UniProtKB/Swiss-Prot annotation:
The lineage of its organism: Eukaryota, Metazoa, Chordata, Craniata, Vertebrata. This is Transmembrane protein 119. Plays an important role in bone formation and normal bone mineralization. Promotes the differentiation of myoblasts into osteoblasts. May induce the commitment and differentiation of myoblasts into osteoblasts through an enhancement of BMP2 production and interaction with the BMP-RUNX2 pathway. Up-regulates the expression of ATF4 which plays a central role in osteoblast differentiation. Essential for normal spermatogenesis and late testicular differentiation. One of its GO terms (cellular component) is extracellular region. Pfam families: TMEM119.
Length: 280
């Protein structure tokens, strides 16, 4: 029965798939079998059994054994992960950073140039900024009424008034000088010449008066009948300058004749005085 028992054990040990080596018999059982005669008979009857120290079957792996990865060990800390990222992508980081810095520099330069162009357009180059901006005026805006300086008095206006008054005075003086002179009657048979500035009508009146005076005696003609007072005659003679020396002599002779007539008395023939019509 012992060989049948051994065969049953071998059959039970063969279909186990997950064991790499055959199941070895326990050492106590082998010793018991070796000490008895049955073990010798069994060994003689079954020479195909392997020795007890060697495995019964050769290893036959049915599934692949898991092998360790050759790559780096995954980081266990955040800082180590960042360092590993920089080490792997150092070239990419350098290129992207340089491009970003270059773009920022170009944008800043363009903005600065634009501001300078605006400043030069508002403040022309020929005039500095100080002429346009008052740095002392911190508040800005127009000045208050108290800060506005008072205007200096305009002397030209006063001069204009003075010249107008002077012009009016000159005009009045000229009109006084241009008044018509006293109409002098002829003395001693000589008629007085009219003064310059008289009109043609005045000359005609003077000529008609001379003709009437020649018809009547000179002694009967007085200043009162003529209606010309002595004061007005003297005033007009002073206001109007004599045109020539001949006219001055004629007026002097006429005044002397009037004085002599006043001293002698009234005229002898009153009829002659009635004929003379007084002329103003």
């Amino acid at each position: 029965m012992v060989p049948w028992f051994l065969l049953s054990l071998l059959l039970l040990a063969r279909p186990v798939p997950g064991v790499a080596y055959s199941v070895s018999l326990p050492a106590s059982f082998l010793e018991d079998v070796a000490g008895s005669g049955e073990a010798e008979g069994s060994s003689a009857s079954s020479p195909s059994l392997p020795p007890p120290g060697t495995p019964a079957f050769s290893p036959t792996p049915e599934r692949p054994q898991p092998t360790a990865l050759d790559g780096p060990v995954p980081p266990t800390n955040l800082l180590e992960g960042i360092m590993d990222f920089f080490r792997q992508y150092v070239m990419l980081i350098a290129v992207v950073g340089s491009l970003t810095f270059l773009i920022m520099f170009i944008v800043c330069a363009a903005l600065i140039t634009r501001q300078k162009h605006k400043a030069t357009a508002y403040y022309p180059s020929s005039f500095p900024e100080k002429k346009y901006v008052d740095q002392r005026d911190r508040a800005g805006g127009p000045r208050t009424f108290s800060e506005v300086p008072d205007r200096a008095p305009d002397s030209r206006h006063e001069e204009g008034l003075d010249t107008s008054h002077q012009l009016q005075a000159d005009i009045l003086a000229a009109t006084q000088n241009l008044r018509s002179p006293a109409r002098a009657l002829p003395g001693n048979g000589e008629g007085a010449k009219p003064v310059k500035g008289g009109s043609e009508e005045e000359e005609e009146e003077v000529l008609s008066g001379q003709e009437e005076a020649q018809e009547a005696p000179v002694c009967g003609v007085t200043e009162e009948k003529l209606g010309v007072p002595e004061e007005s005659v003297s005033a007009e003679a002073e206001g109007v300058p004599a045109t020539s020396e001949g006219q001055g002599e004629a007026e002097g002779s006429f005044s002397l004749a009037q004085e002599s007539q006043g001293a002698t008395g009234p005229p002898e023939s009153p009829c002659a005085c009635n004929r003379v019509s007084p002329s103003v």
